[in-house]
């Protein structure tokens, strides 16, 4: 599973290096060096403001997600919600393989959507990797501090 946060950069052409640890997990845990890069679900910050990150899904994890979205009404989504999820996650998805140096080219439209400029963060999220700009990551961390369930029985049940 993907764990940890790795800080890196993205160049003016949109190239960035996938952290070596995450490339290793793609191959060793998920059995494939291929992955899909797409837009994240909306990150709601400060009321109505919405930001996006990017997400790396291991190849077969993304295919499983596509299968689940074939009949999203079984997930309790309305037809309109399902269409929005498909347009947000599936439409911008690109299949990728890092080059021999571990680099990948992030398409311009995805870079703009996620506001990726220079400093970026790769964040391990179990079966996927989130990618955030420095500014969006700082705001996500602020939200996490506010939303963290301090006195939760669920956390106690997890041993936290």
UniProtKB/Swiss-Prot annotation:
An example GO biological process term is: negative regulation of DNA-templated transcription initiation
So where does this one cross the membrane? none
User: In what residue span(s) does the SpoVT-AbrB domain sit?
Assistant: 5-50, 93-136
UniProt xrefs under Gene3D superfamilies = Transcriptional regulator MraZ domain
Q: Which Pfam families match?
A: MraZ (PF02381)
Gene Ontology cellular component? cytoplasm; nucleoid
Superkingdom of the source?
A: Bacteria
As recorded in UniProt, coiled-coil segments are: none
Q: Per its record, what are the GO molecular function terms? A: DNA-binding transcription factor activity; transcription cis-regulatory region binding
Q: Where in the cell is it found?
A: Cytoplasm, Nucleoid
**Keywords of this entry:** Cytoplasm, DNA-binding, Repeat, Transcription, Transcription regulation
Q: What is its main location?
A: cytoplasm
Listed under subunit, the entry gives: Forms oligomers.
The UniProt family comment states: Belongs to the MraZ family.
Identify this protein by name. Answer: Transcriptional regulator MraZ
Source organism per entry reads Geobacter sp. (strain M21)
Phylogenetic classification of the source organism: Bacteria, Pseudomonadati, Thermodesulfobacteriota, Desulfuromonadia, Geobacterales
Gene from which the chain derives: mraZ
């Amino acid at each position: 599973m993907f764990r940890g946060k790795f800080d890196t950069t993205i160049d003016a052409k949109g190239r960035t290096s996938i952290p070596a640890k995450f490339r290793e997990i793609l191959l060793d845990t998920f059995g494939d060096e291929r992955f899909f890069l797409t837009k994240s679900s909306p990150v709601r910050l400060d009321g109505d403001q919405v930001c996006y990150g990017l997400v790396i899904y291991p190849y077969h994890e993304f295919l499983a997600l596509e299968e689940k979205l074939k009949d999203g009404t079984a997930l309790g989504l309305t037809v309109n919600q399902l269409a929005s999820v498909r347009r947000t996650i599936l439409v911008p998805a690109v299949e990728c393989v890092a080059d021999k140096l571990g680099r990948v080219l992030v398409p311009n439209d995805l870079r703009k959507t996620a506001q990726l400029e220079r400093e970026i963060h790769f964040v391990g999220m179990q079966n996927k990797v989130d990618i955030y700009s420095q500014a969006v990551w700082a705001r996500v961390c602020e939200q996490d501090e506010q939303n963290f369930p301090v006195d939760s029985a669920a956390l106690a049940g997890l041993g936290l």
